[in-house]
Amino acid sequence: MKLILQLCAIALIGSEAFAQSDSLASEKIPFDGMDQTWQNGSDRRDSSVLETKYFKGSVMLDANYTYSFNNPIDNTVVGSTALARNNEMQVSFVSLGGEFNYKNSRAKITTQFGTRSVVVPRNDYSPYRGQYQLNNVYRYLSEAYAGYHFKKWYGINVDFGMFMSYIGLNSYFQCENWEYQASFTSDNTPWFFNGMRVQIFPTKKLKIEPWIINGWQSYGKFNTMPGLGANVTWCPNEKIKLLTNNYYGTDAAGLPNRKRFHSDNSILVRYYNQPKSNRVSKIAFSLTGDFGLEKGGGVNGLKTDSIKGPAQNFISGMFYNRVWFHQNKFAWTIGGGVMTNPGRYLVLYPTGDASPLPNPNNPTTTEGSHPFSANPGDQFKAWDCSSNFSWMPNQSIEFRIEYVHRNSSVPYFAGRGGVTSPTGFTTSPLPSDWKPDLVKTEDRIIFAVLFRL
């Protein structure tokens, strides 16, 4: 009798294990079997050591030291969401969190601490509509959403909350990007959305993802209409990735008749792959082009009109090529981009006494007494180029050194005098004859340590 019970138990366990493996085998996973670790803006790890049945943990740390050859006396960086301080070691981003799943329910929470918890929220004007300081409410979250997974085709995910934007190709997490200081196409477009998305995977190689969101990288809404958009990503094979992001909304505060359209399009190609080689082991490039405009409410998109207003648009592009060496332990990246943005509606505004953003202590006035002009008709053109070298001893850590040159058509970057005060300290009074020192060019070196587990 005892032997029979033992045999029954073995049979039951075996049948359960077979059922589980059969269930896993029958589950359709989008992009399954495709190596996407080489892609600019994607996770370079092939697995996670913090993954369990119900939870996949995440720990990230991004620390940097940067030196601008302009050497501003206030150690302040202007025109970047990756960097905040010159000539100092700073922790830019610390994140703890992970993905939860249980019986098709799903959620993700990713925190953010460090300089980015100030640098990124400052660019959102929507918290000044109404009360409750949304920029403080959300500043320590980079992602926070919950939803449900439907087992249709290769999966359908419906999520509500704050999630990452794909516009501009680059990931918000620097450990996923080829370059540290992103070109204007990426740095001047959204990092996050707050709203609802539906991820539809009709085939193994295709994702269609519509959004209904509060607005263009905004915690709240600027007007009545929500932002509408979608991402389409297609990988015909593991060597090629094509994606397009398109957006429509009203993102000029208090101007509901001013409509914004934006189209962001990228192609990534891995054109050499010898992963076991101790010489060149992989080569790939990414190319991104953006086109957008605002029309109505005193501006006229592509063409200046004496009645409808000046042209207001955004045209940009960026290209990067990356070469990996010695079984992908080392990599060299070179690239850059261009941008034109009449009306300056996507320019990252200078900080300090040059800031045109509302004064947090008195929002009826600008933060700076010499605000950077961002009015309809104001012209802005810029270009940049960069090169970096990375050492990646394993998939969890990367050491990177990067050189960046940036140029603008108007004074924009922090010069030697900085943007704070004659002494560089906020405690010093501002003389009547002093003004922020903005210049047209910037050259800098960046050293970064990027950790991910």
Question: What do these predicted regions represent?
Answer:
Residues D22, P30-F31, L83, V120, ...:
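Outer-membrane beta-barrel pore domains
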Residues D43-G57, K103-A107, K151-I156, K205, ...:
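Short loop/turn motifs that connect adjacent beta-strands in outer-membrane beta-barrel proteins
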Residues L50, A63, G98-Y102, T111, ...:
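Residue-level signature of outer-membrane beta-barrel architecture
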Residues L50-Y54, T66-V91, P422-S428, D433-D437:
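Surface-exposed strand-loop-strand hairpins of Gram-negative outer-membrane beta-barrel proteins
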Residues V59-Y67, I109-F113, F160-M164, P210-N214, ...:
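Transmembrane beta-barrel strands of outer-membrane/channel proteins
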